[in-house]
């Protein structure tokens, strides 16, 4: 799997390519291990430079991990590790609220929307759920919720709790009009998701027309798409038989299936869906979650059979134990238990925080643990030169799949865990996904033959022989400083260039990156710098060979052979020629040249610079030259950039060979500036505008572009810093929040006036929009209930 800026091969997946490099490389040092602190009077303190830098690093790291999870479908850290980062971020914000921006990860749900799919706005926000990782935390949460219910004063003895399995899949929002399925979207950031309608239509059990009657004229149905465990195993067996790499795990496979560009490919995947709630609706009144499940089933929608309405904490704990004992024998993977207040009136009274409902929680099971032998500890060199040790183990089945490798992060982690080569170790899958070595079984250490031995971190890069050193004084990470010429770093950068968040070159995958930079033959690889990527020719690839493991009836034999990668083998009757994938590679390379500026910035592998910062930079400066020439202060002033990213940009452009990449790409036709219409007035300079609902004359992207080219910021969330909210048809919770905060609300005519002539011209429209509130602008039935995505 891969972190957004960096790549890692999935540690539990047999790639059948011998490279010796499979573990992780991350750009930013984890901020784990920081304890929480009370925030009573701390909000009055002025943050020091160190606190501000830690905060900015945390924000960027959380964003990177979200990108890896939601867009790459490839998390690199466990849920628990992510939560530790997130809680540290929340602690700093509680102590220093002046640091909090409205686009902070703590104010958002989920991830950004991929540019590969059309963006669509949910009629009502899709919330996430608060996670707890121990029974003690769960008991505390329920006690707090029951105390809040008691304060409502409605005479209720205590809430009934709908308790159900938390499916490990991808949250999806279905939109039905007059009973007909018209749209399907991913959760995205909770407000806006990706349009995956054509792919969802391939899931046979999702009705395209609801059965029965009494369904609302318009209704959002929320649920989870997943792949059943047995079907996943059978699908992987078929892939192996066909000589293809198996999929890593059911959750990533489901998410990746829904993001296929070709629905015919999605149709081959054994996808299923369970629905668990309703978002926006017109004219439907259900009184409880369990009542809603009954109604959804009557309409022909697939609901989970694994739920119960329970009346006490003891019953909930019994439910958790019962399914915990058999979670790996269920029909599908789960990553916990969801507990919700069943009654909708009580849910509405309890309300929401900025991210999660106060009436629902997700309990995460502790990871399953097994024993296996640690055969060796090797190291991987990542995209930024970070050298990461990883354990090579006797393959063992854990949490539903066979694992043979696990990251050990850095040499300090190896020492802290106390593991030695040859030990019997405790292995688990953190979050039931990421393989993790917990520690040694000390009682068995003296019985090992040969005797165990200490791991010694290499002093030279295993890929290029350069002496290794810490990136900076006191840094626990050891790095290879030979960024330009190290073939391992180049391999990772080339793979990153092709990633979905950068140039999106589907034909340049992990194995292709190896073939281009570290082939078995020829001695001089086709690529010695990413600068020459767009100068590759078919002739350059004709003699490339890689080492690939032989298979017998789909089973790896342990023997390797040299095979051509980019060309067919060729026979006397059929000469060798470029494969279809190779032809696709050249087509996609040509197409990549016209990608927008922000994608080019992501492709450059500049530390800390992900899609969000790249978009902000492209919007603010418009061209690569302008970004290169900007001062550090000018860069830091851009909303969404800040001093850490600004310093990283200046440091990157200071290197001659970095500038050579940009210059060479530009010579080869890569787009280095976004088209700017100089005749468009900058009427929205310094303004933040939020668009919600459907506008007759603008698509969502057109409205956003209209704001950006006039100097404004198009935001996805409403806060006290929002200048205007533009409300179209089916405006959702953003309109409610705007009214609560007193933010001016514009209709479409007011929006056009704002675009044309600025704030003064829109004032009358805002007043008129406010006067129209009683006429039903943005009205919704009282019983609208926003369903969190599980």
UniProtKB/Swiss-Prot annotation:
Zn(2+) binds at residues 461, 464, 480, 486. InterPro entries: BRCT_dom (IPR001357), BRCT_dom_sf (IPR036420), DisA/LigA_HHH (IPR041663), DNA_ligase (IPR001679), DNA_ligase_AS (IPR018239), DNA_ligase_CS (IPR033136), DNAligase_adenylation (IPR013839), DNAligase_N (IPR013840). Residues 15-33 have a biased composition (Polar residues). Its cofactor is Mg(2+); Mn(2+). One of its GO terms (cellular component) is cytosol. CDD domains: LIGANc. It comes from the Bacteria. Residues 777-790 have a biased composition (Basic and acidic residues). GO terms for molecular function: DNA ligase (NAD+) activity; metal ion binding. SMART domains: BRCT, LIGANc. Keywords: DNA damage, DNA repair, DNA replication, Ligase, Magnesium, Manganese, Metal-binding, NAD, Zinc. Residues 1-49, 757-790 are annotated as: Disordered. Its EC number is 6.5.1.2. Residues 679-768 form the BRCT domain. The active site is at residue 166. It catalyses: NAD(+) + (deoxyribonucleotide)n-3'-hydroxyl + 5'-phospho-(deoxyribonucleotide)m = (deoxyribonucleotide)n+m + AMP + beta-nicotinamide D-nucleotide. It is an enzyme of class 6 (ligase). The keyword Ligase applies. GO terms for biological process: DNA repair; DNA replication. NAD(+) binds at residues 79-83, 128-129, 164, 187, 224, 340, 364. Belongs to the NAD-dependent DNA ligase family. LigA subfamily. DNA ligase that catalyzes the formation of phosphodiester linkages between 5'-phosphoryl and 3'-hydroxyl groups in double-stranded DNA using NAD as a coenzyme and as the energy source for the reaction. It is essential for DNA replication and repair of damaged DNA. This is DNA ligase. It comes from Arthrobacter sp. (strain FB24).
């Amino acid at each position: 799997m891969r972190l957004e800026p960096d790549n890692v091969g999935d540690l539990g997946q047999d790639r059948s390519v011998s490279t010796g490099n499979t573990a992780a490389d991350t750009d930013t040092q984890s901020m784990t291990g920081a304890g929480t602190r009370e925030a009573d009077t701390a909000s009055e303190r002025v943050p020091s430079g160190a606190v501000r830098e830690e905060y900015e690093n945390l924000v960027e790291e959380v964003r990177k991990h979200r990108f890896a999870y939601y867009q790459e479908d490839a998390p690199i850290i466990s849920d628990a590790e992510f939560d530790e980062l997130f809680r540290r971020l929340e602690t700093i914000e509680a102590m220093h609220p002046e640091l909090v921006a409205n686009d902070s990860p703590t104010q958002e749900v989920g991830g950004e929307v991929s540019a590969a799919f059309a963006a669509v706005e949910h009629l009502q926000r899709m919330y996430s759920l608060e996670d707890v990782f121990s029974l003690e935390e769960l008991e505390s949460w329920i006690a707090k919720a029951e105390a809040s219910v008691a304060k409502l004063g409605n005479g209720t003895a205590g809430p009934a709790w709908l308790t159900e399995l938390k499916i490990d899949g991808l949250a999806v929002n279905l939109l039905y009009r007059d009973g007909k399925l018209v749209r399907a979207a991913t959760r995205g950031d909770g407000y806006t998701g990706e349009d995956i309608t054509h792919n969802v239509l391939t899931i046979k059990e999702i009705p395209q027309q609801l059965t029965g009657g009494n369904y609302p004229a318009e209704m959002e149905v929320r649920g989870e798409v997943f792949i059943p465990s047995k079907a996943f195993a059978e699908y992987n067996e078929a892939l192996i038989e066909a000589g293809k790499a198996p999929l890593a795990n059911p959750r990533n496979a489901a998410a990746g299936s829904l993001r296929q560009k070709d629905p015919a490919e999605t149709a081959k995947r054994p996808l299923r869906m369970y629905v668990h709630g309703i978002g926006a609706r017109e004219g439907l009144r259900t009184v409880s979650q369990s009542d809603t499940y009954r109604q959804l089933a009557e309409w022909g929608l697939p609901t989970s059979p694994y739920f119960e309405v329970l009346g006490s904490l003891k019953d909930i704990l019994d439910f958790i134990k019962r399914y915990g004992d058999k979670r790996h024998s269920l029909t599908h993977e789960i990553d916990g238990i969801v507990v919700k207040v069943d009654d909708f009136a009580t849910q509405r009274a309890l309300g929401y925080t900025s991210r999660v409902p106060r009436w629902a929680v997700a309990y995460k099971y502790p990871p399953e643990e097994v024993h296996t032998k640690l055969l060796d500890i090797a190291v991987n060199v990542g995209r930024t030169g970070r050298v990461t040790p990883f354990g090579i183990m006797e393959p063992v089945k854990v949490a539903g799949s066979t694992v043979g490798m696990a990251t050990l992060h850095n040499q300090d982690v190896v020492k802290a865990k106390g593991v030695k080569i040859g030990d019997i170790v405790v292995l688990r899958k953190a979050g039931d996904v990421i393989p993790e070595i917990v520690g040694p079984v000390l009682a068995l250490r003296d019985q090992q033959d040969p005797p165990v031995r200490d791991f010694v971190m290499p002093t030279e890069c295993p890929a290029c022989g350069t002496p290794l050193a810490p990136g900076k004084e006191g840094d626990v990470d050891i790095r290879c400083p030979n960024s330009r010429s190290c073939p391992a770093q180049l391999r990772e950068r080339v793979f990153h260039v092709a990633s979905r968040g950068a140039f999106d070159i589907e034909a340049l995958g992990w194995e292709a990156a190896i073939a281009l930079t570290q082939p078995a033959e020829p001695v001089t690889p086709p690529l010695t710098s990413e600068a020459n990527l767009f100068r590759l020719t078919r002739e350059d690839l004709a003699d490339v060979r890689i080492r690939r493991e032989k298979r017998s009836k789909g089973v790896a034999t342990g023997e390797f052979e040299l095979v051509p990668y980019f060309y067919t083998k060729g026979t006397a009757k059929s000469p060798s020629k470029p494969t279809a994938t190779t032809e696709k590679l050249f087509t996609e390379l040509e197409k990549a040249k016209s990608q927008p500026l922000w994608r080019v910035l992501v492709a450059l592998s500049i530390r800390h610079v992900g899609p969000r910062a790249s978009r902000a930079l492209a919007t603010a400066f418009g061209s690569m030259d302008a970004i290169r020439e900007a001062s550090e202060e000018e860069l830091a002033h851009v909303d969404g950039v800040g001093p850490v990213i600004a310093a990283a940009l200046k440091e990157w452009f200071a290197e001659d060979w970095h500038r050579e990449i940009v210059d060479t790409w530009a010579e080869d036709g890569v787009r280095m500036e976004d088209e700017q219409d100089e005749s468009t007035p900058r009427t929205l300079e310094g303004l933040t505008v939020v668009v919600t609902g459907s506008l007759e004359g603008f698509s969502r992207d057109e409205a956003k572009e209209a704001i950006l080219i006039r100097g404004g910021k198009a935001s996805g969330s409403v806060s006290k810093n929002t200048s205007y909210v533009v409300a179209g048809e089916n405006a959702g919770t953003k309109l409610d929040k705007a009214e609560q905060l007193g933010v001016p609300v514009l209709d479409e005519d007011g929006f056009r006036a704002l675009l044309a002539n600025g704030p003064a011209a829109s004032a009358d429209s805002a007043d008129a929009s406010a006067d129209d509130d009683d006429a039903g602008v943005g009205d919704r039935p009282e019983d609208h209930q926003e369903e969190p995505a599980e």
